[in-house]
Amino acid sequence: MQETGVRNGAYGADKFGLKNLKGVKWNLTAPHLYEDALRAGEGVLSGDGSLCVDTGIFTGRSPKDKYTVRDANTENTMWWGGNQSITAEQFENLYQDFLKHAEGMSLFAQDLYGGADPSFQIKTRVFTEMAWHSLFIRTLLRRPETAELASFVPELTIIDLASFRADPARHGCKSENVVAIDFTRKIVLIGGTQYAGEMKKSVFTTLNYYLPDKGVLPMHCSANVGPDGDTAIFFGLSGTGKTTLSADPNRTLIGDDEHGWGKDGVFNFEGGCYAKCIKLSAEAEPEIFAASNRFGAILENCVLDPITRKPDFNDGSKTENTRSAYPLESIPNASPTGRAGQPKNVVMLAADAFGVMPPIAKLSPAQAMYHFLSGYTAKVAGTERGVTEPTPVFSTCFGSPFLPRDPSVYGNMLRELIAKHGVDCWLVNTGWTGGMYGTGHRMPIKVTRALLTAALDGSLRNVEFKTDPYFGFAVPTALPGVPSEILDPVKTWADKAAFDTTARKLVAMFQKNFTQFEAQVDAEVRAAQPEAKLAAE
């Protein structure tokens, strides 16, 4: 077997059971992986030097094909209401079949860290069949110093074989595509898909399982910090604006998607960003645009001009879920440490497909826990298979697909941290205004940015608020530089009766969804939900 690259010679591929390989390329850097990917026909270069790839039939995650081993360790610790199980025997069959499938292959291996805080990071080794997958995970996780690689011993091992096809009868899955996690053995198997996001979300799911026991709240959020050291957290599902809104030229970016919150503050799980780039423009998102159009970036499923090889970010013909992966250092004001102090503000982003929520509202601590557990947003087109237009959904903790433990574990931790550190909480609608999806339009990003700036610099605390008659949270009545009518959603609708009907419908949806959590929260949180009389009238 031919091996190249820097590695721990005493802890190689054989420790994972891989044998009869043609070779392993260890910890290659971006130039090497570009060359390997291009030689293998995995992608092409854009006119600006990005590596452009297609992910095939899977242009998003496939949560229905994700499984966790149910054993003595996970039986009573997993949230089985939100996760699918397979037996240890089925996983072992899958594992052995992965090893067999890999025989004769030349694999790529990366040794990386999940987590910027050394006290809580997980050492992760990722084997991939495709060169661009190796570049992707190297870009998205945190890279050790070269000197650390010689003694690197992984705690978590991932093997991603895109050409593998699972056997539902033998492996306990539903299709040929599979993502299987064994928390006891700390192994993740990914097969049948070229969508690289499955790798990063498997690391996230693993950290979500282990960190609560260490006193750290894992979060599906972005984070940044102001010049005065004021940290802000942005919760939200894919496509709601986490990446866009945290990339603020006046604030230091901690990270765009996954963080932990513990006794010393906030830390990024990752070393890169994975931004949606449909309709990306230099005018609206200059930092992300520049980071996406340079050497080292990976563009997924973007359409290129056949002559200039420039990407057309407005073309969603392959998928609405076009993506750009780039290292954090491509953002000029990104934090090199990936760490910051205790948050001063928590922002919950909701892409309200009904168009009845205000662009910003202030939440009490009880309301914050209520909306965190509710996780209202819209599944935005193309983020997951089978979703072609925004659909209103409730995704608890703004990340239901990634929660291995009961949502109340994360909800209670959030409430305790908010109370302990006196954090201000805000709900921000990045979805629709002037009507529901199909008749209204997306909230202007300039309005959202202006409101967020006012919230984060403290000036929004000094304006007049009124109580929203449907949802009960506090809504500002005016803010300099923002049209006052957009602050009150009913004023943006031509048909006021239709607004009232739609708002009551959404209130009822909130109430129905929250019944699953009522037994796990106290009276104060139960009282924070939209008032029942509005839906009943």
Curated annotation (Swiss-Prot):
Residue spans of biased composition, Basic and acidic residues class: 312-321
Pathway: Carbohydrate biosynthesis; gluconeogenesis
Catalysed conversion reaction: oxaloacetate + ATP = phosphoenolpyruvate + ADP + CO2
GO molecular function: ATP binding; metal ion binding; phosphoenolpyruvate carboxykinase (ATP) activity
A Pfam cross-reference name: PEPCK_ATP
GO CC entries: cytosol
Chain residues that bind ATP: K201, H220, G236, L237, S238, G239, T240, G241, K242, T243, T244, E285, R323, T448
Binding site for substrate: R61, Y195, K201, R323
A biological process term (GO) from this entry: gluconeogenesis
Chief place of localization: cytoplasm
Gene3D superfamilies linked to this entry: 3.90.228.20, Phosphoenolpyruvate Carboxykinase, domain 1 (3.40.449.10), Phosphoenolpyruvate Carboxykinase, domain 2 (2.170.8.10)
InterPro entries (UniProt xref): PEP_carboxykinase_ATP, PEP_carboxykinase_C, PEP_carboxykinase_N, PEPCK_ATP_CS
Subcellular location: Cytoplasm
Keyword annotations from UniProtKB, A to Z: ATP-binding, Cytoplasm, Decarboxylase, Gluconeogenesis, Lyase, Manganese, Metal-binding, Nucleotide-binding
Cofactor: Mn(2+)
Residue ranges, annotated region (Disordered): 312-339
Keyword Glycosyltransferase: no
Similarity annotation: Belongs to the phosphoenolpyruvate carboxykinase (ATP) family.
Cross-referenced PANTHER family: PHOSPHOENOLPYRUVATE CARBOXYKINASE (ATP), PHOSPHOENOLPYRUVATE CARBOXYKINASE ATP
Protein task: Involved in the gluconeogenesis. Catalyzes the conversion of oxaloacetate (OAA) to phosphoenolpyruvate (PEP) through direct phosphoryl transfer between the nucleoside triphosphate and OAA.
Name assigned to this protein: Phosphoenolpyruvate carboxykinase (ATP)
Organism: Rhodopseudomonas palustris (strain BisB18)
Underlying gene: pckA
